[in-house]
Amino acid sequence: MLIRERQRDRVRQALDDVGLADLAPTEIVGEQSVATQQLIEVARALASDAKMILFDEPTSSLPQRDVQRLFEIIERLKQRGLGLVYISHFLEEVRRVADVYSVLRDGRHVDSGRIDDVTDPEIVSKMVGRNAVSYTHLTLPTNDQ
């Protein structure tokens, strides 16, 4: 019986960690929103004491408010020292959550490095598969100046 109680406690803690403390563990996952289903998957990994979590295009079907919530949870997981693999075609998302990047094209490793280097046009070209243009944002003077 003690083992079951520990398991329940871990499930409750995991649901709390992803902001779903009010969700009953017996609720049917398929009846939840897509965002809640994704958070349940993260909680499931946490409850099983995973050392690494894979996020594969996690924002592709989420409304913006849920995207922000997911990023907050990812940041907390990073602070706890969990290993995270974040797969996305959205460069800004990758830059927001990653410390390092790896580029795959057609199943092959093309490049990897520090996320701060992702502004380099050569690296961006490898990511998008075509030449990238670097530009500097200029502020033009108005008639008042």
Q: What residue ranges belong to the model's regions?
A:
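A short, hydrophobic C-terminal helix/tail in secreted or cell-surface proteins
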Residues: 139-145
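Glycine-rich phosphate-binding loops of nucleotide-dependent enzymes
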Residues: 1-138
